[in-house]
Amino acid sequence: MATDPADPVPSRSLRIAHLTTVDMSLALLLATELEADVAAGHEVFGISAVGPYVPRIEARGVTHVPVASLTRSWDPRRDLEACLELFRTIRGLHLDVLHTHNPKTGAMGRVAGRLAGVPVVVNTCHGLWARPEDRWRKRAFVYVLEALAIRFSHYELFQNAEDLATLRPVLKRGRYRLVGNGIDLNRFGPDPEGRRRVRAELGVADDEILVGTIGRRVREKGMAEFLDVAARLRQRATFGWVGPVDETDPTAGVGHTDAVRFIEERTDMPAVYSALDVFVLASYREGMSRAAMEAAACGVPMVLTDIRGCREIGRDGEHLLLVPPHDGVALEKAVERLLTESGLRERLAAAARTRALAAFDQHRVANASLSTYAAVLAGSRGLGRHRRGDSDLR
């Protein structure tokens, strides 16, 4: 949603911390928010488990604060240790604002921040850690945990309207806002020279079609379905997967790996997206897919799964093609359609690029966060009642 120009902004320098489980989230997903906070003159901290992305975080003028006991996986004993360590860490920082992210640190951080006496505790829901098709025990756990954590926050920000609708019954009146998600549109765009360079590195000829996906190599990204499609269509296109192995996912070892070129994480992502002729995301769960937004901004035709977090990227048949999750046959048909119909590829690519420029500006999201901090500090209850925004396609 667009930020109201009348929204307040913090009138003094604040001590702001963003909390995530791993440092990769701070460095890649929250880069623009961190930069906006620093540019506004605030003292900014990034709290997470330590990792290889810490130098990139600190290069942005952000102080990284490690929490050794934080892990992505759920473990009662370690999670209790993490809660206690988080509480001590947050209390010692004497923060004005704690902004929590990710399912696990979102829940822990809201409670720890409020108990530590932080004046403003804000949470962004990047995607509920439960899907409608999940077993009721998992859904009950997630929804009850969120309902409890919400009681400890001052404000809730949502990336997609479906998550907001799910949690609306337990939200505080006037204390939530649909902000959508965004990317750095100054960085992501068509890169013809980068396209030539990356395709040459990969040995992909100009007349070959390159189909790719971007993300961690985990099952919930639709790895099995993508590899199956690659195996069946390997004579008609080259398939690639760009992203790191995730050691926390033991189910990632699926078949047909010989049909795909696995490429480790790269930093020249605009060039990588531009090298693709078709972008595929067969994911089962997304908050609001950053990879899809980046592909759209680079003008790449897309096939996405019809799930929350992907539906917000665009309309089926207008900006992209949507297929049911877990449906390898439908995914194959959609990819094959784009391999066959060059005119459709060109039309979807242009429409996706236009959509990205209109709706996916990360600076708008960062400004919405800053205005939310100011409103809570000022005691305003009028900001952020749910309004239909750019990310709402209905």
Task: Please place each PLM-identified region on the residue numbering.
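A conserved mid-protein helix/loop that constitutes part of the nucleotide-sugar donor-binding site
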Residues: 27-32, 209, 213-232, 293, ...
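Short, structured helix-loop element that forms part of the nucleotide-activated donor/catalytic region
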Residues: 54-58, 237-263, 344
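Donor nucleotide-sugar binding/catalytic pocket of nucleotide-sugar-dependent glycosyltransferases
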Residues: 65-68, 147-193
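A short helix/loop element that forms part of the nucleotide-sugar donor recognition site in Leloir-type
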Residues: 85, 189-204, 269, 382
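Short His-centered aromatic/hydrophobic patch
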Residues: 100-106, 125
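Aromatic "clamp/platform" in nucleotide-sugar-dependent glycosyltransferases that forms part
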Residues: 265, 284
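Short hydrophobic beta-strand element within catalytic cores of glycosyltransferases
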Residues: 301-304, 314
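Conserved acidic donor-binding segment of nucleotide-sugar-dependent glycosyltransferases
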Residues: 316-317, 321-328, 337-342
